Amino acid sequence: MARNRLEDHPTVVQARRRDRTADRPAEPLDASWLRQLCLDAGADDVGFVEIDRPDIADQREDLNAALPGVRTLISFVSRMNRENIRTPARSVANLEFHHTGDHTNEIGRHVVGELEAMDVRAINPAMGFPMEMDKFPRKAWVVSHKPVAVAAGLGKMGIHRNVIHPKFGNFILLGTILIDAEVSEYTRPIEYNPCLECKLCVTACPTGAIASDGHFNFSACYTHNYREFMGGFGDWAEQVAESRNAHDYRSRVSDSESASMWQSLSFGANYKAAYCMSVCPAGEDVIGPWLDNRKAHLTQVVRPLMDKEETVYVVPGSDAEQHVTDRFPNKRTKHVAMSLRANSIDGLVEGLPLIFQREQAKDMSATYHFTFTGDESRQITVTIRDRELDVADGHHGEPDLRITADTRTWLRFLAKPSMLAWALVRRQIKLQGSPRLLRDFGRCFPS
């Protein structure tokens, strides 16, 4: 459209008449006003973090991609009803998660609408889902809410990896709003951690994902609690695809599992546990009954979850499988495939710490040099010693086993270990050292 014709367009004429600068409030935005805007929208607490804060440096590139020119993050919390989360009836707990999640998203959307009307650019990424699933299994979320909330002074991470608000405890969901304006006053992290280190989350977790020394087994939590999300759903879909007929499908998947998956597809994906949140007594509004009678808390909250008869989903040979057997004889294990499957070498390197099973490595002391060729070229050193994993770029030290592999072949091998012999014969995977060490390596990363 020619410029003179564009200038004559009614929309352009009207826009030229309007003084747009009068709509946008002066910067920096008043922090008290912005906080009240969020509280009026339904938030229970609010904090502000500048984009240059070192605490969120690792997110800055992604945040700028989501909202070019972002300058401030508004972090807010929505309080959940505690007893709904504590009940062994997980349908009640999931209803609370879903309702509070929707409420959190509605708060964000309302605040964004108010700011947009003032010519302040803003977006509200989802509290949980939807995410950018085209990036799965790598980072699919737009913003990592937990580090932002901690930086904003809305709590600290507990041993169970949930943010514990000083007043509301861990019975909260988190939201973040990105805006292109500065704020008059930013909030800072609180000076103490509300976590009591009572270790009730360690006791209640059915998969052993939380260890008393602070170690977190991500894959144990992900495999069970998120069974009806993302990778777990993919594993179920593969069971459908591989079944020869209805009888074969029912031999793989129980009627209750099929109904549960239908329920998640129809009413929102349901968590299998989240018991770590259920039993946590931290927070000023929460701690009173626990301080008054810890035995009653154990009897009324912790023990019913521990004693609940249920299926726990585990990867064969994982630490979680052994934990359920040792600690929860009333719970059943069901073998499922590892759903955190890398589709690139970069994804593989990022994922190794997430799927490492340290109890399977208790007798190991070995260094591995990997050289990947083909579609992706990369060298890494993996050291497993004293139940600890270290992954470093490049080759360092003297290895116990050298592995040279074509990238595509190695990724196929991870998905289907039985093809190793074929790959060795074809020289697409080459070993220098004892093959036993490759077997030991695989034991630490079961699939």
PLM region descriptions:
Residues 57, 99-284, 288-300:
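Catalytic cores of enzyme domains
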Residues 73-75, 176, 279, 381:
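Conserved hydrophobic/aromatic beta-strand scaffold that supports enzyme active sites
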Residues 300-447:
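Feature captures hydrophobic
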